[in-house]
Design a protein with these regions (language model features):
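Conserved beta-strand -> loop -> alpha-helix junction used to position metal-binding or nucleic-acid-contacting
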Residues: 143-157
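Short, Lys/Arg-enriched N-terminal segments with co-localized hydrophobic residues
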Residues: 19, 23-37
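Conserved non-catalytic scaffold segment of RNase H-like nuclease domains
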Residues: 31-147, 162, 166-184
């Protein structure tokens, strides 16, 4: 059943089917965990070179089977379009000198696709990573298999609500027992996401 916590002097219960904890007019709703355990999935993280979602410049993937991380993959990617914006560089530290000789996305995805076949994908703020994947499929005119995405950001909001100062990846990872020391390295972020998913999904 959903559980409500008053953050502003009011109390409200939304019922067991409510999905998100939100803050409105001083009300912050927190939900108790009712999640089962997702034991088979692929956690994925993209970093981009610029504001275009197709401009993926690195990818990290962690394969989880039976609740155990059994495989991982990381690659730099030659971005499309091929330019870097300063705010992206400031986030992940990558630049054209890092990806000038990197493989293009189709060559990288050819290695990833067999690893994730039949698995749901998990990402933190899945709308971003799913958007990147769909955009780069369009750019290279690749078939989109329509991967099913699960979002650990949404799961954190459901489970922790206002008990956390924020629901950023490093914050949620720490609560779930993972020390994310290389935030915005795609593989480190995918590993953190996998740890969160094992706790919350």
């Amino acid at each position: 059943m959903a559980e409500a916590l008053a953050c502003g002097g009011k109390r409200r219960i939304w019922g067991k089917n409510a999905k998100f904890g939100v803050k409105r007019s001083g009300i912050c709703t927190i939900f108790t965990a009712e999640n089962g355990t997702m034991t088979d999935f692929a956690a994925i993280d993209f970093e981009t070179a610029n504001e275009q979602p197709s401009s993926v410049c690195s990818v990290g993937v962690v394969i989880v089977r039976g609740g155990v991380m059994v495989d991982s993959f990381y690659s730099l990617i030659h971005p499309e379009p091929e330019y870097y914006q300063w705010f992206c560089r400031r986030v992940h530290g990558l630049g054209p000198e890092d990806t000038e000789d990197a493989p293009v996305f189709p060559d990288v995805w050819e290695k990833i696709a067999p690893k994730i076949e039949g698995l749901p994908l998990v990402a933190h703020n899945a709308r971003f990573d799913e958007g990147c994947l769909k955009a780069v499929f369009r750019v290279y005119r690749m078939d989109d298999p329509g991967y099913l995405f699960h979002d650990t950001l949404a799961a954190s909001r459901r489970h922790y609500g206002c008990r956390l100062p924020n629901h950023q990846l490093q914050t949620v990872a720490a609560v779930c027992g993972f020390d994310l020391t290389r935030h915005h390295h795609a593989l480190a972020d995918a590993e953190a996401c996998a740890h969160i998913a094992l706790k919350l999904l």
